[in-house]
């Protein structure tokens, strides 16, 4: 049976809860709201939780942000600070001090707009490792050494991303790795409006069926934090969501006592999803869909994520000071 594509832990848990009455066994969920941003923390506590939602044991924090194509500078700063606070909570578990090196990796293909989030973020980061090495007297002691790389993809370099990162890790020996990647979602509403942070590493391309070498503490020997935004949704998922909206609207317009209402209510969600996939697949294959404004959206999201990472990695500096280094 085809499984719905999603890289988001919060969606994986929702899918499990749709199939069972007890969705919390082995999984703890906390939700809070900061103004217009809803923050959901999913903790996969044990093997049971891992099996149920098919996500590795660890912490996954999801930020649902307002869906706007273009944010003004105040909006970007506000969202960046909230994101930085949540990222800092994950980073704190690695017990870093200001002298420890962080490697930031921008995964993805810069030639494909929805997959270019990682490389775009790298271009907006405050990188300091070279400054700490070559002009240490000109740099404040509280500034952490940060280095960054956008390794490209197998089709461009001929090398597995994991091989490239492993070689870099062996040479510069970072104390923490932060990976940024574009993800896939199972709901249209989460495309380009959700940021996920996790401390279990990442498998580049897994959301779209391109399984590459896992980047994690197990494979690299260094703690790996993954930051991602879903930028695409499967065409079958989009069709399924559209039909769900139609069904819900029809339910509201017919009497609950009618046979037609009973028929609508009896439609099995999983069977419907599978039917849509089987009908569409011969015609469109593995088609992925992204909004037409994706160029502007990627620019905005990369600013938000880069600013948030800069704030989280350089707690001794104000954002205005960070921007002097970046701009």
Swiss-Prot record:
Keywords: Hydrolase, Protease, Zymogen. It is an enzyme of class 3 (hydrolase). Its EC number is 3.4.24.78. The gene is gpr. It comes from Clostridium acetobutylicum (strain ATCC 824 / DSM 792 / JCM 1419 / IAM 19013 / LMG 5710 / NBRC 13948 / NRRL B-527 / VKM B-1787 / 2291 / W). Initiates the rapid degradation of small, acid-soluble proteins during spore germination. Belongs to the peptidase A25 family. One of its GO terms (molecular function) is metalloendopeptidase activity. It comes from the Bacteria. This is Germination protease. Autoproteolytically processed. The inactive tetrameric zymogen termed p46 autoprocesses to a smaller form termed p41, which is active only during spore germination. Pfam families: Peptidase_A25.
